[in-house]
Amino acid sequence: MIEIKDVGKIFGDTKVLENISLDIKEGEVFGIIGRSGAGKSTLLRCLNGLENYDEGSIKVMDKEVKDLNNIELRKLRKDMGMIFQGFNIMNSKNIYDNVALPLQVWKKDKKYIDEKVRELLKLVGLENKAKSYPRELSGGQKQRVAIARALTMEPKVLLCDEATSALDPETTKSILKLIQKINKELKITVVVVTHQMEVIKEICNRIALIDGRKVSAYGEVKDLFLRPEGELKKIIEQEELLPNEGVNIKLFFPSNASQQSVITSMARELNVDFSIVWGKLESFRKEVLGSLIINIEEDKKVAICEYLNKKSILWEVI
């Protein structure tokens, strides 16, 4: 659906994106993460032509974005809804009129506008707020208005630029559930830019980490978070303090393996002692995955590693 190849972007004398190559599949929720100033929001805005790119290619639904004229670009943006951290709704208009605005701009008839606005307000849980004004709403409700407005033209792609950054954790969860619902029920491809790791783990299928203008990590969320490397490991704060003596082994428990009593079985069957340094379970789109670090004596390393291989447990010496 979206093909990004060797994209570069320059502001003045500064290169902010370099050799960016990604493939975003139809129907998935794709996350773009990175530290502030990494260029992730700039990349997102290149997808719908809000920003120009200086090098490479961006094809959205088989259309090269930089080759589109103004009319073609307007049609592309019609197929790409967008929501922002700051909501961008008009305080002088009530909720109904805020959602109706794009439909009015595209000169839809009044009956269609009324039906569409009420349908979308129901979808986002604001059917009773049609006549309310933004000042009467919470931050989460304002973002729901923005989401409803972004869906008015029945887009094929929804771009989310730090859409939950201004919200409290509980409200963030409710907005993420709504985005998942939209992705599933309306079959809309979602591209999420965020610095919030919980957002990525909760709704994304795959992610790309932008660091130093380039993509430094790219793949399935659970794979990258279970075995993070480099900048991603720093971002998710997994730099751990480890014992200096013995051998430290990190175990990974994807899918059903996380439910097995591997550790107690290993201790019993091999008759070995070891220390558990730390462990945790995390949820990735409702799939529970775990990791654990154990410290063992050097002479037990071969037996334990053979046991882990036999049980098909992923592991690495760290």
UniProtKB/Swiss-Prot annotation:
Compartment(s) of residence: Cell membrane
Topological relation to the membrane, as annotated: Peripheral membrane protein
Provide the E.C. number(s) assigned to this enzyme: 7.4.2.11
Q: What class of enzyme is it?
A: translocase
**So what does this thing catalyse?**
L-methionine(out) + ATP + H2O = L-methionine(in) + ADP + phosphate + H(+); D-methionine(out) + ATP + H2O = D-methionine(in) + ADP + phosphate + H(+)
Locate the ABC transporter domain: which residues? 2-237
Entry keyword set: Amino-acid transport, ATP-binding, Cell membrane, Membrane, Nucleotide-binding, Translocase, Transport
Give the chief site where it resides.
membrane
Residues recorded as binding ATP, renumbered to this chain, are 34-41
Q: Name one GO cellular component term.
A: plasma membrane
Subunit text: The complex is composed of two ATP-binding proteins (MetN), two transmembrane proteins (MetI) and a solute-binding protein (MetQ).
Q: Tell me the function of this protein.
A: Part of the ABC transporter complex MetNIQ involved in methionine import. Responsible for energy coupling to the transport system.
Q: Which family does it belong to?
A: Belongs to the ABC transporter superfamily. Methionine importer (TC 3.A.1.24) family.
Provide the protein name.
Answer: Methionine import ATP-binding protein MetN
